[in-house]
Amino acid sequence: MVETLLSGIILGLIPITICGLFFTAYLQYMRSGNSFY
């Protein structure tokens, strides 16, 4: 029971962390891109 709960939490956290990393990288890219103009 605990293992399934842990695997569910890990499977739920992995996409959220990946989306967060892409979001922060996108924001930094937009900021650096806007500063060039």
UniProtKB/Swiss-Prot annotation:
Function: Component of the cytochrome b6-f complex, which mediates electron transfer between photosystem II (PSII) and photosystem I (PSI), cyclic electron flow around PSI, and state transitions. PetG is required for either the stability or assembly of the cytochrome b6-f complex.
Keywords linked to the UniProt accession: Chloroplast, Electron transport, Membrane, Photosynthesis, Plastid, Thylakoid, Transmembrane, Transmembrane helix, Transport
Protein name: Cytochrome b6-f complex subunit 5
Gene Ontology terms: cellular component: chloroplast thylakoid membrane; cytochrome b6f complex
Pfam (any one): PetG
Compartment(s) where it occurs, according to its Swiss-Prot or TrEMBL record: Plastid, Chloroplast thylakoid membrane
Membrane disposition: Single-pass membrane protein
Gene Ontology biological process terms from the UniProt entry: cytochrome complex assembly; photosynthesis
Protein family: Belongs to the PetG family.
